[in-house]
Amino acid sequence: MAYVSMKQMLETGVHFGHQTRRWNPKMRPYIFGARNGIHIIDLQQTVKLYRAAHDKIVETVAAGGSVLFVGTKRQAQEAIATEATRAGQYYVANRWMGGTLTNFSTIQKSIERLNRLETMFSDGSVNRYQKKEILTLNREMDKLELTLGGIKNMERLPQLIFIIDPHRENIAVKEGRKLGIPIMAVTDTNCDPDLIDYIIPGNDDAIRAIKLFVTAMADACIEGEALQKDTKNKNLEEELKQIATAECNKESTSIEQELIIASEQTETKENNIEESVSEVVITNESELITE
């Protein structure tokens, strides 16, 4: 398990918050001080809280859950899309559509539409339409891909949401809280930490700082996936052992039953022989007496 170090956080500027005039007083416990009108985040707390968040992601994925990565600001888009894909998770990197979670059944219809359009273009069936109609369908597909591409394979709601800048992604936060989905977020000094279940105090504007955390959380997902596979393999081995043991017990019981039956048959034969011998002896004695 490789955690991000405090040195890495310093090198990527995680400790730089917003201007002191643009702050949320609720973030006071996570602020070390101020320098040149900029709040400085207490990295000792960031390290501790980041590790707790990292472990939560590992635990969630290891248990078979999924994580939704959210970051639509320009600085976060590339890292969110790239790292979530690498980890085999879902993401929203462009625009959060209202109801993405709270109205998931309707969103799924749009996803189905996107999948149908992609199929039409891939198998060539779109060619039966006129050129103008094809252009219209292509624009529709591109638009849907832009907003839903990162969740088009998401068949059920995620078990955890990881957010860059919850102040900007306030709708995603509200939807997650309404559905009881845990929220984890890189939270700058202008955010409300009370809305976040797993807070990671840090710079949510610098590209390097964002990439550091997004990559770390993607690694945590991969780690959890590996643990999940190990658990499945162990469970499979245990099941196979139980089956083998049951078969052995069944075979042993069958052999014991066969031995008992054979023993009973032998005993019966011996009794029959004894009875036959007795009958012969009695017959011979009777003949001798008669003579």
UniProtKB/Swiss-Prot annotation:
SUPFAM superfamilies: Ribosomal protein S2 (SSF52313). Pfam families: Ribosomal_S2. Keywords: Ribonucleoprotein, Ribosomal protein. One of its GO terms (biological process) is translation. One of its GO terms (cellular component) is cytosolic small ribosomal subunit. InterPro entries: Ribosomal_uS2 (IPR001865), Ribosomal_uS2_bac/mit/plastid (IPR005706), Ribosomal_uS2_CS (IPR018130), Ribosomal_uS2_flav_dom_sf (IPR023591). Gene3D superfamilies: Glucose-6-phosphate isomerase like protein, domain 1, Helix hairpin bin. One of its GO terms (molecular function) is structural constituent of ribosome. The keyword Ribosomal protein applies. Belongs to the universal ribosomal protein uS2 family. This is Small ribosomal subunit protein uS2. The lineage of its organism: Bacteria, Pseudomonadati, Thermodesulfobacteriota, Desulfovibrionia, Desulfovibrionales. The gene is rpsB.
